[in-house]
């Protein structure tokens, strides 16, 4: 409840050489603050609006007019994320039948607005959709969600848009510390941990990412790229959540983002969650994902100013996430 103003946040992005941002909802205060900033944006269409948008093109046209066209080209919107972590196996299952119709309607509305070559339409998913992730080459979607994931992958393939994926080695490690080592989760393993044919894995992030690539390939989406739309590590509030672990993970993720994974070498567009600690979030660990304190002081000694790297940040009405892409 004590976060900086929208204009202060955008100024912080610019001062830290942060070149992209994710907004989880079309907050007009944030969008107005972004005008003329040259910061590229992932603009979220919230879950609560997905059913409405799916119900008719007139709703999609209105949403695009009010939240995209009214700010374009002053705000450089790069992607629209239609929903976040909608899944048949979570509390969002009631929205699953509306996911693809909403994607299609927003895609058509963006095309009608003359922005089809500028803005890609996608959705953000989490790892609960993956049934098998080990070894990474055997990655596959859960059989009971294929009816949901296959049409999404097909839509992204046909429209040449990437899948947005939230990847958190922290949760895999904290949920199974007996099987997953901390160094493997923090990018600090001294040796190969997983040998998968000719591919070698020294960190869990790559293994998780490549399992999603394999899953998409198995469903006809071998040409679909991935943007890591969230990743981070909490500094307090739960098992393994310490200041040192968070600093190590973030520092190594920043460095690793320019390298790519064994399956897909090259820069990985990766968004760090979150920009600020937030005292109103629950459970406790959700309060401690920030790169910065609400007073804009950095929690970690992270280098945002390397000339060949552009940092991205994403923001909610109440929270911010930061993302990195390198070798621009």
UniProtKB/Swiss-Prot annotation:
Compartment(s): Vacuole
GO cellular component terms, A-Z: vacuole
UniProt cross-references to Pfam families, sorted A to Z: Glyco_hydro_17
Alphabetical UniProt keywords: Glycoprotein, Glycosidase, Hydrolase, Plant defense, Vacuole
Gene Ontology MF, one: glucan endo-1,3-beta-D-glucosidase activity
Induction: In response to infection, elicitor, ethylene, wounding.
Enzyme kind, highest EC tier: hydrolase
Any GO BP: carbohydrate metabolic process
Protein family (similarity comment): Belongs to the glycosyl hydrolase 17 family.
Function: Is thought to be an important plant defense-related product against fungal pathogens.
Name this polypeptide is given: Glucan endo-1,3-beta-glucosidase, basic isoform 3
């Amino acid at each position: 409840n004590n976060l900086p103003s929208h204009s202060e946040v955008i100024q912080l992005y610019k001062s830290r050489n942060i070149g992209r941002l994710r907004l989880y909802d079309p907050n007009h205060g944030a969008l107005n603050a972004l005008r003329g900033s040259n910061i590229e944006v992932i603009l979220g269409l919230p879950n609560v609006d997905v059913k409405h948008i799916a119900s008719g093109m007139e709703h999609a046209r209105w949403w695009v007019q009010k939240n995209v066209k009214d700010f374009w080209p002053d705000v450089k919107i790069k992607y629209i994320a239609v929903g976040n972590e909608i899944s048949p196996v979570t509390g969002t299952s009631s929205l699953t039948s509306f996911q693809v119709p909403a994607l299609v309607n927003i895609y058509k509305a963006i095309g009608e607005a003359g922005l089809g070559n500028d803005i890609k339409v996608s959705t953000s998913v989490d790892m609960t959709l993956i049934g098998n992730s080990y070894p990474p080459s055997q990655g596959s979607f859960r059989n009971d969600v294929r009816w949901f994931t296959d049409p999404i992958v097909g839509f992204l393939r046909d429209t040449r848009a990437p899948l947005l994926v939230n990847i958190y080695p922290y949760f895999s490690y904290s949920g199974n510390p007996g099987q997953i080592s901390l160094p493997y989760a923090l990018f600090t393993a001294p040796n190969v941990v997983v040998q998968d044919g000719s591919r070698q894995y020294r960190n869990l992030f790559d293994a998780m990412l490549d399992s999603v690539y394999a899953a998409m390939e198995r469903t006809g989406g071998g040409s679909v790229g991935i943007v890591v739309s969230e990743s981070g590590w909490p500094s307090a509030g739960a098992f393994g959540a310490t200041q040192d672990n968070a600093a190590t993970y973030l520092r190594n993720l920043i460095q690793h983002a320019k390298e790519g994974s064994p399956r897909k070498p090259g820069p990985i567009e990766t968004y760090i969650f979150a920009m600020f600690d937030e005292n109103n979030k629950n459970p406790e660990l959700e309060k401690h994902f920030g790169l910065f304190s609400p007073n804009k002081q950095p929690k970690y000694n992270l280098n945002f100013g390397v000339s060949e790297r552009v940092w991205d940040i994403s923001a909610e009405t109440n929270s911010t996430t930061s993302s990195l892409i390198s070798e621009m």
